[in-house]
């Protein structure tokens, strides 16, 4: 004999709830995985932009190399970056007195946050250059001594920055950098 009709509806309702609850859990897990993927992708892209962009910036400041910085920085920020303005006006002590042949540039990403659906990101980074290879120019030896400069290149100030980045046409650019604090070299 067949069970009463009411019993069939009960089992059907249970089946629907079971399937729908599992689908909801599956959708939530897939959504979280998608968000984690995009967060990781943004974090990787931002780290590469910060690492390469800050290294090129230091190269321009120390070596006077006219590297193209627009792939990393917004043009508006390049016009108001104090170290770049000083270097481009010829007032950088690295360019005035020394011949810099290389340096060890390090960036540590202290904090980062960007929602996957936003086009702006904030990061806190620490920039340090523990070693600068270079020597004083023979023609600038007297001027450097008068300015109180040593024969070896001056140390780079280790600095912690808050960086604001924006994504334009799928490409991240550093839009603003604010000094959080100056750190002692360790």
Question: Where do the PLM segments sit?
Answer:
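N-terminal Lys/Arg-rich, disordered targeting/topogenic segments
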Residues: 1-18
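Hydrophobic membrane-insertion alpha-helices, especially the h-region
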Residues: 19-40
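Core segments of small alpha/beta cavity-forming domains
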Residues: 36-109
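Sterically constrained small-residue positions within well-ordered secondary structures
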Residues: 100, 114, 154-156
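Generic structural motif
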Residues: 105-111, 174-177
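Short edge beta-strands and adjacent turn/loop segments
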Residues: 110-120
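Exposed beta-sheet edge and beta->alpha loop/turn motif
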Residues: 119-186
């Amino acid at each position: 004999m067949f069970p009463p009709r009411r019993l069939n509806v009960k089992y059907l309702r249970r089946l629907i709830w079971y399937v729908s609850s599992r689908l909801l859990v599956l959708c939530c897990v897939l959504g979280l995985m998608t968000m984690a993927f995009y967060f990781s992708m943004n974090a990787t892209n931002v780290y590469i932009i910060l690492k390469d962009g800050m290294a090129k910036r230091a190269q321009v400041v120390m070596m006077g190399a006219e590297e193209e910085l627009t792939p990393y920085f917004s043009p508006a920020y390049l016009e108001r970056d104090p170290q770049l303005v000083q270097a481009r006006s010829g007032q950088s002590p690295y360019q005035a007195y020394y011949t810099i042949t290389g340096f060890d540039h390090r960036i540590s990403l202290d904090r980062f946050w960007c929602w996957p659906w936003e086009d702006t990101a904030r990061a806190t980074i620490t920039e340090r250059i523990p070693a600068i290879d270079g020597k004083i120019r023979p023609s600038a030896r007297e001027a450097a001594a008068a300015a109180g400069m040593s024969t070896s290149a001056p140390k780079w100030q280790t600095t912690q920055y808050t960086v604001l980045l924006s994504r334009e046409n799928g490409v991240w650019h550093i839009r603003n950098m604010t000094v959080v604090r100056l750190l002692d070299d360790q």
